């Protein structure tokens, strides 16, 4: 069994392809989620502004509506953070999978591929 050196350029290309595949798929999901959520938050802000301007929202209830907007924004950001963390794990898993497979092939051994998040 002869050692088979790793083609570094190919390895870099394979890692980029693995990461890009995950990112393209997840970016579409993130983009759709973000667009819907931000539109809903913007619409709510518009309703609050109209309510304040027309006095339908009183001084007594104004803070309640503003706090609700803050909560919507915080919920959006927290959900986005969670989705991004999942995407980062997927990218890490894809890159490590490529690396471990390249090492296994070059060294003619079978290495168990670690998985982040398990």
Residue spans of the language-model regions?
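Cationic, hydrophobic amphipathic alpha-helical membrane-interacting segments
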Residues: 1-118
């Amino acid at each position: 069994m002869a050692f088979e050196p790793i083609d570094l350029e190919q390895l870099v290309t394979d890692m980029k392809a693995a990461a890009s595949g995950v990112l393209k798929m997840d970016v579409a999901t993130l983009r759709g989620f973000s667009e819907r959520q931000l539109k809903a938050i913007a619409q709510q802000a518009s309703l609050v502004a109209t309510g304040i301007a027309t006095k339908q929202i009183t001084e007594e209830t104004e803070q309640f509506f503003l706090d609700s907007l803050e909560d919507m924004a915080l919920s959006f950001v927290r959900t986005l953070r969670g989705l991004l963390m999942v995407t980062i794990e997927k990218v890490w898993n894809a890159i490590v999978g490529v690396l471990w497979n390249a090492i296994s092939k070059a060294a003619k051994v079978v290495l168990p591929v670690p998985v982040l998040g398990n």
